[in-house]
Amino acid sequence: MTAAAPASAAGLRARAVRNLLFATVFWGLSFPVMRALSFTQQGLLPDASSWFFTALGVTYRFGFAGLLMALFFFRELKNISRRELEQGAVLAFFGVGGILLQMDGLAYTDASISAFLTQGYCVFIPLWVALVHRLPVTWKKFWCIALVVAGVTVLAKINFHSFKLGRGELETLLASLLFTGQILSLEHPRYAANRSTNFSIVMFLLMAVFAAPLVWATAPSAAACVRAYASWPAGGLLALLVIFCTLISYTVMNRWQKHVTATEAGLIYCIEPVGASVLALF
């Protein structure tokens, strides 16, 4: 039995890594999709601000995702625990801030650059662990991080001669800091017994609620909330974000990330810019 337990744990970890890689591919799709949606909506509402499009997109994207999940998992929600509510709220706080900054930043920078800068959490996470838990970053982790950053730089085709830190780049770096908090919250021992479906629903719905006041503050008119998606391309891009980049990617990440460390998760998520760069070619 003692030999079976480590084997079982290793198998579970390997399965978690595979599922996180799968989810990250769909998450990487969000970068070119959000970029394309930004261009589409600027044609529909040329006078609206990027913050309006960003906040409205978050409200619709996560609101629809949360409602769809609530319909399918209504029975589980009946006995939702206080810690599941708490974890969902914490994840929503970090998530909505990160997504708002990331989506607005995409209006001012390329999808591949946005995906590259978002990977800042693969550096932020081990630094946080080292500072808070007083655990030094091992040479193995250091070289893994260095190799990942170098590889992502090459694959995302980052040109440092023309690279600049403008509004889009700075917003994306701030988003990465918030995503760091989200990743760390998923592995917190306090939430180990939580059911991922329940706190994911809370997270999605609260992200929509948190973004709604920004929609109200930046909307040119009430009709603009409908006109922003009053075309087949805009509606189709929103559907892609809801189904693939939210329902599939987030629920898989929320379910499986606890079986790896936060540092490992951050390194796995670094394949995002590869997919984003490839998809941005089409």
Model regions: which residues?
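Hydrophobic alpha-helical transmembrane segments of multi-pass membrane transport proteins
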Residues: 21-33, 89-108, 154, 173-185, ...
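C-terminal transmembrane-helix exit sites in multi-pass transporters
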Residues: 76-77, 102, 121-146, 274-282
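Hydrophobic transmembrane alpha-helices of multi-pass small-molecule transport proteins
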Residues: 69, 137-158, 176-179
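Glycine-/small-residue-enriched transmembrane alpha-helix faces in small-molecule transporters
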Residues: 1-56, 93, 101, 161-188, ...
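Transmembrane alpha-helical segments that form core, pore/gating elements
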Residues: 24, 35, 66-69, 125-126, ...
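Membrane-interface helix-cap regions at the ends of transmembrane helices
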Residues: 36, 40, 63-81, 150-163, ...
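Hydrophobic/aromatic residues within transmembrane alpha-helices
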Residues: 37, 57, 105, 110, ...
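C-terminal-most transmembrane helix of multi-pass membrane proteins
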Residues: 2-9, 58, 62-63, 157-158, ...
